[in-house]
Amino acid sequence: MPITLDPEKLAIVMKHRFQYKICRECGAKNPPDAVKCRRCRSRNLRPKRFRKK
């Protein structure tokens, strides 16, 4: 089901799809406020990227 341009629905989708961090060493998903990776304990985290087509 495609998302229309309703700003409230779009904000909810963006929060759930892009508001977390990815570990650069093991690739695990982590919460947005994480300092260390939950799986490998590395501090090398990056925010999830948003790419427009």
Curated annotation (Swiss-Prot):
Transmembrane segment boundaries: none
Family: Belongs to the eukaryotic ribosomal protein eL40 family.
Source lineage: Archaea, Thermoproteota, Thermoprotei, Thermoproteales, Thermoproteaceae
Single GO biological process annotation from the record: translation
Entry superkingdom: Archaea
Gene source species: Pyrobaculum aerophilum (strain ATCC 51768 / DSM 7523 / JCM 9630 / CIP 104966 / NBRC 100827 / IM2)
Any GO molecular function: structural constituent of ribosome
Coiled coil: none
InterPro entries: Ribosomal_eL40_arc, Ribosomal_eL40_dom, Ribosomal_eL40_sf, Ribosomal_zn-bd
PANTHER family: 50S RIBOSOMAL PROTEIN L40E, LARGE RIBOSOMAL SUBUNIT PROTEIN EL40
GO CC list: ribonucleoprotein complex; ribosome
HAMAP family recorded: Ribosomal_eL40 (MF_00788)
Protein name: Large ribosomal subunit protein eL40
Keyword entries, A-Z: Ribonucleoprotein, Ribosomal protein
